[in-house]
Structures are given as C-alpha cells and as structure tokens.
Amino acid sequence: MKLTVFGANGLTGRLLTQLALAEDHDVVAFTRRPDAFPIEHRRLEIAAGDVRDAAAVASAIDGTDAVLSALGVPFAKVPVSVYSDGVVNIIAGMHAAGIKRLACVSSSVMSPYPEPLGGFIFEKIMQPYVVSKLGRTVYDDMRRMEAIVSGSDLAWTIVRPSGLFEAPAVSAYGVAIDHIGHRFTARIDLADCLLRQALSDTCVRSAIAVATPGAKPSMLKLIWQEGIRKKP
C-alpha cells in the first residue's frame, strides 16, 4: 500500500513513517522542512510543502491509496487554523485523486464523554486550565477539523489519543469508539493505531479513542512536550 503522511516530521509522524516502512508500505512524507527529515528509505518519497498550500497537498496525495494526518502545532494565544485549513486541502486533494481512506489525529479533549480519571487537582485545576486557557485556540481548531472531516463523504476515522508520552515499542494498547477509560497514550501506540486504520475499514466514519493502559508519565512533562515546546 502507498500512504501519504501529513505532519510526517513531527514526533508522531516520524514514528508512523517508520512503522509503515518497516511493513514494506510505500510512504510519501509531507513536511515543511524536508532538510530536517531524518528518515531515509528506498520506499520513502519526501514531499516538501505547507499543508495550507492546496496544490502541494494535492500533488503529495495523487497516486496514493490512503492518507494519514499527524498534523500538530504547539499551544498559542493567537488563533490556530492549521488543522482545519490543512484538512480542507487534504479532502480536496483526495477528491481530485479519487482516494477515500483518511485517518487523522485529534485529541481526547474532543470526546463528548469525559470520564473522571485524574483526581481533584487534574480534573478541577490542570485540565480546565490546559483546555480553556493554554490550549484553547488549538482545541478550537481541532473541533473545526473534526466537523469538516465528519461532514465529508470520505471513509474517515478520527483518532483521539489521551496525554502523549514516549515509549520504546508498541504495546497492547486499547481502542474504543468515542472514549476509553485511560489518561495516557504512548506515541508509538498512536502511530501504530493510525497505520492500522489505513489497513482496515473496521472504524470507518467513527471517532475512536486510543490509550495505553497502566501508563503513568508526568503530566507536567506532557503539557510541556505536547503544547509548549516548539514542534520539529
């Protein structure tokens, strides 16, 4: 299978690219900074461009079998539109190329079924601050992205991880429709889940939660890594 990966130079995108190549898939890795992309492989094609450039996006999609979006941006005080603008161009490119399968990363924050998982400090102080203050503009745009994707005629899947952390290998992670009772997701599990969506139609036209049971990373480290530090 040939896959186009958007956000390929991010931490999740790199893992996704590596996993796909390890399974002998062909990958088109779309990135704004091709000079900084660290992966080389005979089955890899690097496509330079910005996801807000419709022509570049369409060119990267043409001739592939499925599209995976691992787009991500740090928290910002200013309005964010990368997710929504990007997915509009991705969907247009898929329509032009006659491609139907799309899986994209969102966040467990988007779930309409919140669960009490973190205790008083997490639920009453940390999470509300991150969602409504620190990450408000990012999550606002994720909501727009989800609405655009779910309103399309594509065979889409929205993948919602919980707090992301690093792990050395894919685990026996959990997947469920809409929500799952765990607070954290190993990034490599998220990448593997995205790849599985491209290879299956089990969760088509669904939002799924993916999480790593038993994980207990530092919440403050996660907030810094996912929302504050500059993305690669």
Regions of interest found by a model, annotated:
Residues 4, 28, 157:
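Conserved beta-strand positions in the Rossmann-like core of class I SAM-dependent methyltransferases
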Residues 4, 35-89, 93-96, 202:
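NAD(P)H-binding glycine-rich loop region in Rossmannoid oxidoreductase-like domains
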